[in-house]
Each structure stands twice: as C-alpha cells, then as structure tokens.
C-alpha cells in the first residue's frame, strides 16, 4: 500500500460553546467552566488508543471542530498536538485546522495556536448581515467578524470563512453582494452551508421556495467561477 493510501486525518471535537445557535445540531453544550487539563488528559488517552490501531500510518490532516475550539487555551492545543506528533508521522504538507467563532478571537491566543502548530483557521462568520446574524443566534457583530478576519490573517497564511446561504428573505442581489464582500477580505478559502440543510431549534425560520434556493445555489457557483 502506498504512503498516500495509508495517509489519514484526525478530527478532534471540542463540544463547548458560549451559547447554542438555533440551527446547530452538532454535539455542543454551553458550559460556564471547563476543566481543560482533564480534557487534555482525555484527548491524550484517545490519541494513544487510536495510535495503537493506526501504527505506521501518515497523518495528513488534523481538524479541531466543535463546539467552539477557539475557546480552548493555547496550552491545551499545544498539549494535544504534542501527543499527535509523538504518535504519528506527519505529512510534510499536513494541514492543521482550528475552527473559531469571531467573538472568541484574540490575537494573543491565535499566536499561541500558531506556535502550537495550527496552520489554518476556519472562521464561523455565517453572515455579513446584522439582522441575519441575530436570526441565526450568532453572538458576534459584522464589525467583530471583520476584526476577527484581520486578526486571523495577521497570524495565519490560510484563513477560511463560512457563510450560510438561502437564508430567510435573502435575495439573489443580497447574496451576490455578500459573496463580493467576502471575497474582498482576501481569505484563502470560502466555505458555504445552505440553510435548507440546517435544522433550526426552538423557533421556526421560514425557508425559501425550492426554486429560489436553486437560483441562489446557481448564483453562488457562477459568481465564484467568475471571481
């Protein structure tokens, strides 16, 4: 078996958030206090367990998801990645990603993540419209989103942002404008999630017609190809 065929990725889940977004059906929980040393010990034990089953394999991706991984202390991320490096051979071009929410972005913490080995940050912007941010239950503002992107770009070469499309009352013109503004940030990658596939909790958010959703999706594809 070739080295490429034996390569694999590791996903590390940090399940804690400052609040629960209404569309989120991931394993995430609001906690006022988290014993990060205990969680580091648990991560290390799980890495050891999986490492014993994957001996000799090459690691080409590591992804910290959540939840809100940017609530982790840099020392916790450092400890996890130290155990990862001690357990597996890392590919020369290994991508080590950490998801972050704009409201929990701090330059000093990001610098600590970079020293630990993080080389890509994915920012959960979700929308550049204040009303939509409120409807989506997001805690950050558009200004905080812009600031977070700037901080991330000052530390990391690879920064991506997530946007949710086909949102309630969103027009094609508004989506085109939002895509244009997102690309103006100069991020390395733009990821999108469509609202039709997200489950909303506690309150109903009226969805678009199927025809309007498809038009939005086509607009996204055509716009990104042209830019």
Residue ranges and their predicted role:
Residues 1-10, 55-57:
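N-terminal [4Fe-4S]-dependent radical SAM core
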Residues 28-53, 57-226:
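Conserved non-cysteine loop/helix-boundary elements of the Radical SAM core domain that shape
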Residues 5-7, 21, 59, 93:
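Sequence-level motif detector for i,i+2 pairs with an aromatic at +2
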Residues 13-28:
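Local cysteine-cluster metal-coordination motifs and their immediate loop/turn environment
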Residues 10-12, 123:
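Short beta-strand motif preference
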């Amino acid at each position: 078996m070739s080295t490429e065929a034996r390569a694999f990725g590791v996903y590390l889940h940090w399940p804690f958030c400052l609040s629960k977004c209404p569309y989120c059906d991931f394993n995430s929980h609001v906690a006022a206090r988290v014993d990060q040393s205990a969680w580091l010990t648990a991560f290390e034990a799980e890495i050891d367990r999986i490492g014993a089953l994957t001996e000799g394999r090459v690691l080409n991706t590591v992804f910290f998801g959540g939840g809100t991984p940017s609530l982790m202390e840099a020392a916790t991320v450092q400890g996890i990645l130290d155990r990862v490096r001690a357990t597996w051979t890392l590919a020369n071009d290994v991508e080590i990603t950490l998801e972050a929410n704009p409201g929990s972005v701090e330059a000093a913490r990001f610098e600590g993540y970079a020293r630990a080995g993080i080389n890509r940050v994915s920012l959960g912007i979700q929308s550049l419209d204040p009303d939509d941010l409120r409807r989506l239950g997001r805690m950050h503002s558009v200004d905080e989103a812009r600031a977070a992107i700037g901080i991330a770009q000052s530390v990391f070469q690879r920064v991506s942002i997530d946007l949710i499309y086909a949102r309630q009352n969103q027009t094609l013109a508004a989506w085109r404008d939002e895509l244009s503004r997102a690309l103006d940030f100069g991020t390395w990658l733009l990821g999108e999630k469509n609202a039709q596939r997200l489950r909303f909790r506690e309150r109903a958010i009226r969805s678009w017609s199927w025809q309007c959703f498809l038009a939005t999706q086509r607009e996204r594809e055509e716009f990104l190809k042209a830019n």
